[in-house]
Amino acid sequence: MGEGGYRQINKTLNVCAFDDYLVTQQSRLPKLLDIEQLSPRVLRVLGQNAGKFTLQGTNTYIVGTGQHRLIIDTAQGYREWADLIDVTLSNRSISLSHVFLTHWHGDHTGGVPDLIRMYPHLADGIYKNSPEQGQHPIEEGQIFKVEGATIRAVHGPGHSHDHMCFVLEEENAMFTGDNVLGHGTSAVEQLGLYMDTLRKLQAQGCRTGYPAHGAVIPDLNLKIATELAQKTRREKQCLAALGRIRKERPTGQLASVTVGELIDVVHGTRVNEEVRKMALEPFMEEVLRKLAEDGKVAFRVRKGVKTWFALT
């Protein structure tokens, strides 16, 4: 399934509603090579799972300069990826000593069984935050070393609770996982937590980003700043709409609206119904939850109907 982990995280999102948009978006993506040496220490192998939400496919990264190297993420479990890994290691006379998983989504963990099948010693070399049985934990600030590469783990929840990023100290670079993509923006589980994570990643001061999907990010700080600005703009847009609604209501009447009514104000009433129900409403709900955490909005439930209103 081409959507990979995004299908898992966005269970309410019917991707068919965005087919035209996504096909157009995908046609504009730069082509990435199946196997490409990105730097003296970083080799990228594409997961062969290109799709609407996985972009050109999941990027898996072989890191180090010596015979024994580590790999970050394992794609989705397609045999074509496993074959590419086998060819890559054989042609370069190198082996894998560690497997790091950025998070639990299937387009990042699906290749683990193939790696263990091909290289049985890796059964004791799988590392993940909130590990499954038989895996080793990854903690904030933990350091891992192979020849030519020092990796520092950074916990970055928001896209998923267990998400880890990895700083490559020798290059002042970061493997950003799904927190920062090479193109577009990532889906999130919890917007406020995700924005905190973006600020935390920005504070690492890394120059280059190696994302789990899409091309290398040459200016990671700029990319993160742009992402934060977009999210902040959505919040302001939502608050402004609630403010307009309050001004239009009679004095003394609580200006509370449903998510659907708020979307009418922000996006208009001519939005495709499927897009509204399957995408805009869940996203607006997440923005409102974040604003509620910030103490800027609140909600009430009357007769089973939740309505939202501004506090400021």
Curated annotation (Swiss-Prot):
Highest taxon of the lineage: Eukaryota
Catalytic activity line of the entry: atrochrysone carboxyl-[ACP] + H2O = atrochrysone carboxylate + holo-[ACP] + H(+)
Cofactor: Zn(2+)
Pathway in which the depicted protein is active: Secondary metabolite biosynthesis
Amino acids binding Zn(2+) 1: H103, H105
Keywords linked to the UniProt accession: Hydrolase, Metal-binding, Zinc
SUPFAM superfamilies: Metallo-hydrolase/oxidoreductase
Gene Ontology terms, MF aspect: hydrolase activity; metal ion binding
Listed SMART domains: Lactamase_B
Enzyme Commission number: 3.1.2.-
Stored CDD domains: LACTB2-like_MBL-fold (cd07722)
Biotech applications: Secalonic acids show unprecedented anticancer activities against various human cancer cells and might be interesting for further derivatization, targeting diseases such as cancer.
Catalytic center residues: D107
A Pfam family annotated for this UniProt entry: Lactamase_B
Annotated cofactor note: Binds 2 Zn(2+) ions per subunit.
Described purpose of this protein according to its UniProt entry: Atrochrysone carboxyl ACP thioesterase; part of the gene cluster that mediates the biosynthesis of the tetrahydroxanthone dimer secalonic acid D. The pathway begins with the synthesis of atrochrysone thioester by the polyketide synthase AacuL. The atrochrysone carboxyl ACP thioesterase AacuM then breaks the thioester bond and releases the atrochrysone carboxylic acid from AacuL. Atrochrysone carboxylic acid is decarboxylated by the decarboxylase AacuI, and oxidized by the anthrone oxygenase AacuG to yield emodin.
PANTHER family assigned: ATROCHRYSONE CARBOXYL ACP THIOESTERASE, ENDORIBONUCLEASE LACTB2
Family: Belongs to the metallo-beta-lactamase superfamily.
Name of the protein: Atrochrysone carboxyl ACP thioesterase AacuM
Gene name linked to the record: AacuM
